[in-house]
Amino acid sequence: MSLNYKTTEWDSKKVILGEGPLNSELPINILVGFHGAGSTPENMLIHGNRLKLKNTFMLFPEGPVDAGEGRWSWWVDGPNQKDSVNDFLKFSSNIISMAQDHLNNRFENIETRNCLWGFSQGGAAALVLTLMGTHSLYKVASVCGFLPEVPEQETKSDSLVPILGIFGTNDDVVPSFLAEHALEEMKNNGHSPTLRETPQGHELNAENLKELCDFFDS
């Protein structure tokens, strides 16, 4: 199943759109892929291109925070992290709304389901958006993700979201206890995480991608 890609600009940021055949008579999954810190949507696209998913509209946005040398992040570290995460929440909610509008302009009376996945800080982005974002979510996956400092506002409690959390015991960037803590926090907030501890390091590998395919297509 080959995917067609095009690059566009939404909310003043680069977004790569990818799709295969879409059947508007069935629910269409909108799958947002968040790259890691100091990275690019192209790096995430390399992995996303190996996800063979049915009836899925993929998008790979560029992070709003300039990390230098053409690389991007979702928020800044340090004392301003909470405010920066709040800006990320607004930015990402806009991107999801624009994806919905994009499909609604092409198809009549369609049902869309919002899904998120990400690696490292991108996994953290998916988890934060699940906790505090404005859109309802169908499924969420995090690989080597964690939770940053979050703004002091109420978390969502409207629905239970299935979450696949993959993390490695040999990860020297995001220690497994941080990833596990983040997923437990998701559970404490009413969501349904499946914790998958592996011997991997800080990476997104072929076995991870197979699990992601099974998760999003089930």
Predicted regions and their residues:
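A conserved short beta-strand
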Residues: 135-147
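Gly/Ala-rich beta-loop-alpha elbow adjacent to hydrolase catalytic centers
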Residues: 117-122, 126
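Short beta-strand/loop motif that positions the catalytic acidic residue
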Residues: 164-167, 171
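Active-site signature of alpha/beta-hydrolase-fold catalytic machinery across serine-
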Residues: 46, 128-132
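Short alpha-helix in the alpha/beta-hydrolase fold that links the catalytic acid
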Residues: 44-47, 175-185
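Conserved alpha/beta-hydrolase "nucleophile elbow" surrounding the catalytic nucleophile
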Residues: 35-37, 118-119, 168
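Serine-hydrolase catalytic machinery in alpha/beta-hydrolase-like enzymes
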Residues: 6-109
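C-terminal catalytic histidine-bearing segment of alpha/beta-hydrolase fold enzymes
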Residues: 180-218
